[in-house]
Amino acid sequence: RRGFKVVHMTGFFLNFLGATDSASNLGGIQMNLLFPFLIVWAIVAFIMYKGVRRGIEVVCRVTLPILMLLIVLLVIRGITLPGAVDGLNYLFQPDWSALKKPSVWVAAYGQIFFSLSIGFAIMVSYASYLPKKTDVVNSACITATANHGFEVFTAIGIFGIVGFMAGQQGVDVAEVAGGGVGLAFMTFPTAINALPAFNALFAICFFGALFIAAITSMISILQAVIASMHDKFNIDHNVATT
């Protein structure tokens, strides 16, 4: 099982992504990724050209409810699978000894900084469009609470499915659970493929949710840069977007 997992990861990073063994070796262009890459950037560029009101706000009003619906479907399916309890026990059973590991704290800081966009100027950029009398402290508390609550809710569905996969393979949940790219593009697709029914539907739910989360993150990061260029150097919005 361990050997299969290593081969699976190697195949994904080397064959599909075209990853190299050195940062100085850029490798070649992956043609299977070039077209989707250009499409995504074209979508993002169109949204950014539309501005905050007609672009970002409209996209968020449409995509975020869809994201929540997709996640709800995944969670419902995840907790109803055989073996889901094992995955949830793994998720919520604390391992206090892990707090002694610096890598755990680094991962936690990295997660929270990215999740709440701390240090990216994204919150400052978005907050600048609020009315002047807005209670910023209250808004910040609501944002942090909603973000963390949604993350835990999503984790319940993910670890339910991971627990199911561990049961199917006859291994511990710890051997199946991973993080980052490996979990999203290797472990989870394998788990979805092993579902007893409606595999395609839940694959659409998962990757649809992942796409929405990714593209809204791209938009927020770019908006911080564009707003900074506009405010600091008085550059026109469309010029800054370009």
For each predicted feature, which ranges?
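Membrane-embedded translocation segments of transport machinery
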Residues: 57, 61-215, 219, 233-234, ...
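Short amphipathic alpha-helical surface micro-motifs
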Residues: 29, 71-72, 224-225
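Inter-helical loop and helix-membrane interface segments of multi-pass membrane transporters/permeases
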Residues: 1-49, 53, 85-106, 178-185
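C-terminal ends of transmembrane helices
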Residues: 48-54, 128, 225
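Interfacial segments of multi-pass membrane proteins
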Residues: 228-230
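Hydrophobic, membrane-inserted alpha-helices
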Residues: 41-43, 122-124, 224-226
